[in-house]
């Protein structure tokens, strides 16, 4: 297999680090890790310091020149800039997608004959998809949707934005259920089902599989991920995340006074 370069936008998050760990297992994969804080990334994954297969791009997502350098000649781009906190007015996913679209448009305009567009793989959620969440009890889905309402609205708008580019950009929408920081057990992609809790490592492996699929059967599709060798452990931080998220949904003025960085542990 010829060498492939993968860009990971949101490298310091649980999904971003899991993507890098999985990609490092593939000898011919090169990684462009985009982050705001290089020391934080190296603290999480110190092996990157000496790796000649990883290039770290430190900066804001609005740095057009840096982002173009990160995306140039990539096989796939993983859009995993997100938050577990239900922040009122959240637009992290929208900002990332908008910046990526603009950067790729600029690359294409500057090199119209030689620029090959990468596949974009967006981390979304099964809660936003009626098909993938059809087996979730209605009351639970009601609670889950409101506990991350601002984040989900951001994702819904982002998906529409990416769908609007389908004449020149291919996107894939990965929509897992509950996520957990746990070991890798085995996964399968599904267009009809999701199964949680799912480990971030299994999620990352599924995202890479979708990006590498060559027949195009996953292009512009929403995909769930199911466990194939047992579920991940229960994410202990999730109950607090749901509670605080509900408070932010119903009482957004409390946002500055509520804890941050809640979510799966």
Swiss-Prot record:
The keyword Zinc is assigned to this record: no
Enzyme class label: oxidoreductase
Known EC number: 1.-.-.-
Protein name (database record): Oxidoreductase nsrR
SUPFAM superfamilies listed in its UniProt record: NAD(P)-binding Rossmann-fold domains
Gene3D superfamilies: NAD(P)-binding Rossmann-like Domain
UniProt keywords, alphabetically: Monooxygenase, Oxidoreductase
InterPro entries: NAD(P)-bd_dom, NAD(P)-bd_dom_sf
Role according to the record: Oxidoreductase; part of the gene cluster that mediates the biosynthesis of the tetrahydroxanthone dimer neosartorin, which exhibits antibacterial activity. The two different monomeric units appear to be synthesized by the same set of enzymes, among which the Baeyer-Villiger monooxygenase nsrF is the key enzyme for the divergence of the biosynthetic routes. The pathway begins with the synthesis of atrochrysone thioester by the polyketide synthase nsrB. The atrochrysone carboxyl ACP thioesterase nsrC then breaks the thioester bond and releases the atrochrysone carboxylic acid from AacuL.
Keyword field contains Oxidoreductase: yes
Single Gene Ontology MF annotation: monooxygenase activity
Pathway(s) where this gene product acts: Secondary metabolite biosynthesis
Protein family according to the UniProt entry: Belongs to the avfA family.
Pfam families membership: NAD_binding_10 (PF13460)
